[in-house]
């Protein structure tokens, strides 16, 4: 039997939509089929749990970035402003999968004190932690009505595997194993709940068919690592003339798509409202490559308005070393080239035509369920920041 022990530390996590949140840190102990464990946990929940929405997200920690969904991709304002609670637990001694390498107690996985030279991993810890949360230990999270799971990239791959393993049976109502580059060979046959997978063009692998409890999506032109302060800090060199691909950064940010799909999944579970149908990139007749338009952009999939109106060629992966380990990480960044200007022969004749088309593309995404209202308005606002520039050119000029 596993136990979420009394928190060793707690602190304010801020106030969101007039609801105060508290972050708890402590030790989770027990035994799986691999042996005993004692690992760090972290829970962020309303100070008065009953005032939240009683839906809790268990995040599998990422090997490099730890709690990537809560901190970077969805964000605290998005989650906690809507009343969700969040929790994570260490399950491996490799990198930040441990969640906290110095929690103030001995970390044990698979019956062994963790040693970086002898990595230990036990994914069963994640599902035991989720099940223990339903018991509302120490009244930290309230009476949970729905339990979700989420992971991105490295942690999305781990969650993919968890969802196919017997120990996860009937654990989660909804899961988001995302941008994991696994493709059809690892397509989960989940033992519990509904599944939503978003993959970027870089991560996209052909899939066959669909199922009532799964939805699969792919973002055209999207790199594995979306635009962020992290990517901009790595790629600071000025563009040259003629303009090469602006390697490492891209205005095709997929974070808004993921937020819309998260809300769609939540409504799927709580209201029975179907999410958008599976939407994938189009393949060549041979089925072994992505179809592209004359500009070189991928066809099909979820299409950012800048890509849909043809502002540039958007590249899902660029061949560029970056000054951080490990070396292969460069493949995870995107870029863009062949940027078009208003008045170009193969583009819009005037600014009014351009803005009208961009706005229509953003509204179409919103109607399809791939953009929230606030993100639709934000995209159109960014396209209008300069009366002679496109969304891509405004991005390139650093206006947003």
Which residues make up each language-model segment?
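Loop/turn elements at helix/coil->beta-strand transitions in domains of secreted/extracellular proteins
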Residues: 51-56, 82-87, 143-147, 170-174, ...
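Surface-exposed acidic, glycine-flexible loop patches that form ligand/cofactor-binding
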Residues: 44-52, 75-78, 133-147, 166-169, ...
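Primarily recognizes the serine-hydrolase "nucleophile elbow" in alpha/beta-hydrolase
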Residues: 64, 139, 143-187
């Amino acid at each position: 039997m596993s136990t979420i022990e009394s928190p060793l530390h707690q602190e304010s996590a801020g106030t969101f939509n007039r609801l105060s949140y508290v972050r708890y840190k402590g030790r989770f102990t027990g035994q799986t089929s691999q042996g005993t464990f004692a690992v760090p946990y972290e829970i962020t929940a309303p100070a008065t749990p009953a005032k939240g929405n009683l839906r809790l997200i268990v995040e599998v920690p990422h090997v490099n970035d730890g709690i990537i969904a809560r901190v970077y991709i969805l964000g605290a304002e998005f989650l906690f402003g809507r009343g969700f609670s969040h929790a994570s637990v260490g399950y491996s001694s490799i990198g930040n999968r441990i969640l906290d390498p110095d929690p103030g107690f001995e970390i044990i996985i698979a019956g062994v004190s963790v040693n970086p030279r002898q990595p230990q991993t036990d994914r069963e810890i994640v599902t035991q932690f989720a099940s223990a949360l339903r018991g509302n230990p120490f009244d930290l999270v309230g009476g949970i009505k729905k339990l979700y799971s989420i992971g991105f990239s490295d942690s999305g791959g781990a969650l993919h595997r968890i969802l196919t393993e017997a120990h996860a049976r009937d654990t989660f109502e909804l899961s988001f194993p995302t941008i994991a580059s696994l493709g059809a060979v690892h397509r989960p046959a989940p033992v519990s709940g509904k599944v939503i997978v978003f993959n970027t063009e870089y991560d996209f692998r052909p899939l066959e068919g669909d199922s009532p409890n799964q939805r699969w999506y792919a973002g055209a032109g999207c790199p594995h690592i979306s635009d962020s302060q992290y990517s901009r800090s790595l790629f600071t060199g000025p563009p040259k003339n003629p303009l090469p691909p602006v390697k490492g950064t891209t205005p095709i940010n997929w974070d808004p798509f993921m937020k819309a799909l998260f809300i769609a999944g939540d409504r799927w579970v709580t209201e029975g409202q179907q999410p958008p149908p599976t939407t994938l990139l189009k393949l060549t007749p041979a089925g072994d490559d992505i179809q592209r338009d004359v500009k070189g952009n991928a066809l099909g999939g979820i299409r950012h308005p800048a890509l849909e109106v043809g502002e540039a060629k958007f590249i899902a992966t660029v061949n560029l070393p970056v000054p951080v380990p490990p070396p292969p990480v460069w493949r995870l960044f995107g870029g863009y080239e062949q940027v078009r200007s208003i008045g170009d022969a193969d583009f819009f004749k005037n600014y009014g035509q351009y803005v009208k088309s961009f706005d229509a593309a953003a509204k179409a995404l919103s109607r399809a369920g791939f953009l929230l209202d606030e993100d639709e308005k934000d995209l159109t606002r960014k396209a209008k920041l300069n009366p002679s520039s496109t969304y891509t050119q405004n991005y390139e000029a650093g206006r947003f």
